[in-house]
Amino acid sequence: MGKITLYEDRGFQGRHYECSSDHPNLQPYLSRCNSARVDSGCWMLYEQPNYSGLQYFLRRGDYADHQQWMGLSDSVRSCRLIPHSGSHRIRLYEREDYRGQMIEFTEDCSCLQDRFRFNEIHSLNVLEGSWVLYELSNYRGRQYLLMPGDYRRYQDWGATNARVGSLRRVIDFS
């Protein structure tokens, strides 16, 4: 079970809304989101309703300003509680449809290019656990939530290009 409280203003001020499960449309409850407090679980915030648009990964902790979660604006229109898994395994492929060179990860990787000579990933398989893929190294840039399953091309995980700089396991430390 997870719990997140979203606040309209910075510093946990203004109108707020508490969630303990997935919420596809926050618009009736909040006009904007400038701060958040994650009491338990790991969450993905989405810029648009129905889990679309830019994504922002939050772990347990206080985020007094939307820039602390790398938010580009105060628009948060949906949120998802990410299921926890004990083990993690992901395979990344150089080309679409699981072709070309492959590398498998079971741990976080802050710089993909240090481990895999490519900085573009065109397909992947999430075999165990949930992962967050980042467009840039050191867990920066656009973020993409990956749940167990097959992703035959980068558009399948919502990306507009194949650039991948880092990846992180979703682990709830609570």
Curated annotation (Swiss-Prot):
Keywords: Cataract, Disease variant, Eye lens protein, Repeat, Sensory transduction, Vision. Changing residue 24 to S: In CTRCT4; reduces solubility. InterPro entries: Beta/Gamma-Crystallin, Beta/gamma_crystallin, G_crystallin-like. It comes from the Eukaryota. Changing residue 43 to R: In CTRCT4; much less stable than the wild-type protein; more prone to aggregate when subjected to environmental stresses such as heat and UV irradiation. Pfam families: Crystall. Residues 84-87 are annotated as: Connecting peptide. Residues 2-40, 41-83, 88-128, 129-171 form the Beta/gamma crystallin 'Greek key' domain. GO terms for molecular function: structural constituent of eye lens. GO terms for biological process: cellular response to reactive oxygen species; lens development in camera-type eye; lens fiber cell differentiation; visual perception. GO terms for cellular component: cytoplasm; nucleus. Transmembrane segments: none annotated. It is linked to Cataract 4, multiple types: An opacification of the crystalline lens of the eye that frequently results in visual impairment or blindness. Opacities vary in morphology, are often confined to a portion of the lens, and may be static or progressive. CTRCT4 includes crystalline aculeiform, congenital cerulean and non-nuclear polymorphic cataracts, among others. Crystalline aculeiform cataract is characterized by fiberglass-like or needle-like crystals projecting in different directions, through or close to the axial region of the lens. Crystallins are the dominant structural components of the vertebrate eye lens. PANTHER family: BETA/GAMMA CRYSTALLIN, GAMMA-CRYSTALLIN D. Has a two-domain beta-structure, folded into four very similar Greek key motifs. Monomer. Belongs to the beta/gamma-crystallin family. This is Gamma-crystallin D. It comes from Homo sapiens (Human).
